[in-house]
Amino acid sequence: MAAELPFYIASSVEELVKKHVEGVEVDKNYSIFHYLSTCNNLVKQADIYKSEGDIERTYIYSLRFCILIFEKLQKHPDFNKESFTKSRNEIKRKAELKLKELEGLKETLKKGYERIQHKKEEERKRIEREKEKERIFKQEKLKLEREQQLLREEEEQRKREDLELESEIQRLKEVEDFENRKLQAQKNIKRATSARTFELLRQEALLEERKRLQGIETEKKRILAEKQEALEKEFQQQLFEQQEKERLEKERLEKEEQLRLASLPPPPPDYSSFDSDQLLNLIENNNKKLENNNQTDDKLDNEFLLDPSFLPPPPPIITQPSPSQEKKDNNNNNNNKNTTAQLPLSITQPPHMPNNEKKLPPIYNSTSPIQFGYPSLNNSVNNPPSFSLQNNTPLIQQYKQQQQQQPIQSPTNNINRPNIPQYNNYNAKPLSSNLNPLPPQYQPQQQQQYQQQQQQQQYQQQQQYQQQQQQQQQQQQQQQHQLPKLPQYQPIENKSISANGLAQSPAVNTPSITPTTNKPNIDSSEASKKYSKLRKIIVHGEVFQEFMRLAENNTKRSIETCGILSGTLSNDVFRITTIIIPKQEGTTDTCNTIEEHEIFEYQLENDLLTLGWIHTHPTQDCFLSAVDVHTHCSYQYLLQEAIAVVISPMANPNFGIFRLTDPPGLETVQKCKLKSFHPHPPVNGIPIYTKVDHVDLIWGKKSDSKVVDLRFLKK
């Protein structure tokens, strides 16, 4: 037995019994198993505190134990139940031993309290003696202080008289100095008045001169402003006239350009799709036409033979000409100032496809008139090209290959390209030989608006994605602050266990999580502050994994599994060392133990205390249902540190540790007589249960914790 600890709970045996033993009652609604477990807990705690030398707590738990056994528990209707005969006899035997120990403990407590009272009395007398000595010392000190006060008063009186004499002499000197300063001040005032008058006159003269100069300057500014305003009006009039002339000139040029474009001949047919026979027939027909045509060159222009498959050539690719080409262009422009660009018509080079060796088409801009490279009718008609049947087909194929290799420049790829006619389909046929359909025109503003809309949609999607990521991070941080998460549960196949201690198997179809109603905020500060300081409980997390492995068969069938948390007490700290899985009957929402005497007998044989209970929620979240709070009330009523552990493989986090608030949760559930599922609203804003803060959950360290399965124990 350890050394006896000093008494600290009470000052007498009567006070100890009144505060910590009286008020123990038996509730018939709680099973006899809970009371027998409580008796076992009491006697175990009494033995532990006795070994630690805590006589007061040993007496408290021993007296509670004896009162329950010999007075209160015999009134329970199941006390004489046959299945608990062995356990009941063992408890009675321990109660008789504790009853004998109580007399010795009571005498030890009385002697200890008497020693404490004697020490208190001695301390009181010592304090009185100290007070008497202090009183005499204060009287002598006060007398000495009075004598010293009289001496100080006489000295101060003498000093005051000396000070009064010095003060009178000083006053006379000050009067004389005052008269002298008064005379000097009057002289200074007269001198200052004269100087101020002179300064005022000088300032008035300066002010008049300044006003005169300001008037002259103002007049100059006014005249200058009038001249400037007249010049601006004249300049604006000239500018307006010049702009009007430019506008009229621009309109005239635009009309001339429109008339010139309207008079242009239609573009030549596309010879690239013709074979050699078609080209020969076309040339023969054209020659016959020309022989029969005796009109002028202008009429020949209008009556030029059009192929039914005619379409205007594709838009020229805008390229930057080389310096040599620019020089060549300038020479051609000087020779042909009033004509359009001319291209030779030959079988090897279509008119709308310039050769690399030929002159490049001019770069169009928005200010210069638009010109199309049509072939000259005079040259093409008067001097028809000669065709060779032997070389027709290879040349056409070569031309088609060049046309396929030639890159087609899209209008959208060059934002600086002028707004010129564009043709989308080069194989489409015109409605008639004399009517060309208007081609669609490229509109850069629509393209820019479309790109802006796409950018805005992408930006909004990015903002929504970032907000969702921030919300998920905040939820994860809140969950990490609440409780550590058990490794994700998975059902096992053929009892194969993974490296992290939980079972691994193919997925099993499980019902969806049942949505729960609005549960109270069990994490609120009010809920955690409403119960007194509790003794700490230490538990290793690996024992929960082992429990889930053994409960896997029920979990796959969506049936709840329960167990009893058992452990030891040392240095005022509980340690959960064993989870007992008893014989039980379970459904998807409830779990009831049977053959409870086996649990109690195992605890007696292994010196274990009941510290709470554990059960699973295969299809629900981690919380205490109405049935669960009534079940836990029987544990916490008999041991205020008792906890309830809920494991839900489908929740996140997948387990929780709870207890009833005290007050008001424990008292509320005790008074509730309803059965089955029913709501328990918060009381004055405080929920009836909360998460615990007196449990230390340890992971990764080696421990001797275990799970004992009594479900398959033979009778």
UniProtKB/Swiss-Prot annotation:
Motif JAMM motif positions after renumbering to this chain: 615-628
Top-level EC class: hydrolase
Compositionally biased residues, Basic and acidic residues: 287-302
Gene Ontology cellular component terms for the protein in this record: endosome; membrane
Gene3D superfamilies, A to Z: Cytidine Deaminase, domain 2, Phosphotransferase system, lactose/cellobiose-type IIA subunit
Cofactor(s) this protein requires: Zn(2+)
GO MF, one annotated term: metal-dependent deubiquitinase activity
Binding site for Zn(2+) 2: 630, 672, 678, 680
UniProt entry keywords in alphabetical sequence: Coiled coil, Hydrolase, Metal-binding, Metalloprotease, Protease, Ubl conjugation pathway, Zinc
Keyword Cell inner membrane applies: no
Residue numbers spanned by region Disordered: 287-367, 398-450, 502-527
Listed Polar residues bias regions: 339-349, 410-427, 502-525
InterPro entries: JAMM/MPN+_dom (IPR000555), MPN (IPR037518), STAMBP/STALP-like_MPN (IPR044098), USP8_dimer (IPR015063)
PROSITE patterns: MPN (PS50249)
EC numbers for this chain: 3.4.19.-
Amino acid composition bias (Low complexity), ranges on this chain: 398-409
PANTHER family, per database record: AMSH-LIKE PROTEASE, FI19924P1
Record comment regarding domains: The JAMM motif is essential for the protease activity.
Family the UniProt entry places it in: Belongs to the peptidase M67C family.
Name of this chain's protein: Probable ubiquitin thioesterase DG1039
